[in-house]
């Protein structure tokens, strides 16, 4: 039995970290303290200064524990690590632990590559970023590959080494084949220097040079070459447009501000690299209530830079708590000096004001959209409750479906809707293991049995304090189950629920002869629903989603199997050649279309294996 009064009296007057727990033993808050005794006791003292969030948290505290550290900076580091590990309910939590993508030029290599990475290390490479949108990094790298003939392979290529046969990229003009020693290191570096100029925003010089070459080609009646150079100029200008200079300095800086409306807060981050905005990101944190902005920003920085891959030289904020301590922590993580600054006037202050305006607009738009969706979903759940005569609104709904082709690779899927919205983090997939052939009823019985067996097992582990509630994958049961089918599927579900003595209403989602959602079956009767109403739209959405999720899983399994069988059936093609073929040709279709010469261009292929591939796909 935890004696709260005794534990409060015996708190040490040393720095450390404290962990608040609820009645399930789940950690709901992690904090650091310069003096544990003073900080922890503050929570249990009646005070008007406590925010609504703190008051709500204290009501849920059943016990606490603490860890003593040697210094406040050690406490801060431990706090960040524990928050990342436990994801406590009452800490500021960003939706994901983002490691933003960078473009990496591997300058430590004799013949550098341009690749995407989410990890910045001191390895002699040059990094550009971070980019908020991962797809934009992919697009930029693809555009660079089309414009500059640089290698894309992972081979360890050294100048003067033994030459090897170049791959297909050389034959189609996408690479200068340093592997075959067709280009000198110094010549290749000139190409890489242009890539670096482009990524640094100095693309105008490159464009000018390309234009001169284009005009020269046109004068010499080399129209195909001129057209190719024109296309490359368009690509370079497209990349250059992605980044706009707003400052004349060349520092790496982040600008962070926030806007609160009294209940929720939006944080906005602008990333400036070499004087250009390379991206921005926003985070909505709900239920911050009247927490002061300096505390919010301090907590946000710990969460944001505790997870992100890159810490800039300077971070600008409107105000902050524990500034010196956070600077020390950031510098330790970065392994070089990082500074937090609060601009009072000038262009830095103007940028920070712009960030705040963006945060305000983002929060207002979020609230407007949220309120509109909430009103819509609330009405749907209310109508669903009335149509089915349920005791409560079905806040959590789980839908199940089976997918197979002629009995092979049977899979089951479970999708979840909470408060009317899809919750993909709770979706689950089941590979059918006990059923032979195409038997949807037995397959459905298997996945439902597994789902509720897991759930009951997790609930017991939570009750025995062997599992935290937030770690459970099946411990939350639905208020309503929707089966993708009629009475047969409903009866299977009810049979499984009765086995476990679980009482949950079960409906069947039925379709017409044109495979369109027709309505619901409940308690043995089909319920007439307005086909143009919001409930019908919602049911259709659930049915489409569970079917899509099952089909996508089935396709992935089927794809793996067909991929495997096709390649493994080709004589003289082992694991090494199989990997090389896929790496160079990207797909089975491309391998089918490959010529004898193209197959031979793969280093691991010889005449015999190339002939085997051609013969197999003849």
From Swiss-Prot:
Belongs to the UvrC family. CDD domains: GIY-YIG_UvrC_Cho. It is found in: Cytoplasm. PROSITE patterns: GIY_YIG, UVR, UVRC. The gene is uvrC. GO terms for molecular function: DNA binding; excinuclease ABC activity. GO terms for biological process: nucleotide-excision repair; SOS response. GO terms for cellular component: cytoplasm; excinuclease repair complex. Keywords: Cytoplasm, DNA damage, DNA excision, DNA repair, Excision nuclease, SOS response. This is UvrABC system protein C. HAMAP family: UvrC. Residues 13-92 form the GIY-YIG domain. Residues 204-239 form the UVR domain. Transmembrane segments: none annotated. The UvrABC repair system catalyzes the recognition and processing of DNA lesions. UvrC both incises the 5' and 3' sides of the lesion. The N-terminal half is responsible for the 3' incision and the C-terminal half is responsible for the 5' incision. Interacts with UvrB in an incision complex. Pfam families: GIY-YIG, HHH_2, UVR, UvrC_RNaseH, UvrC_RNaseH_dom.
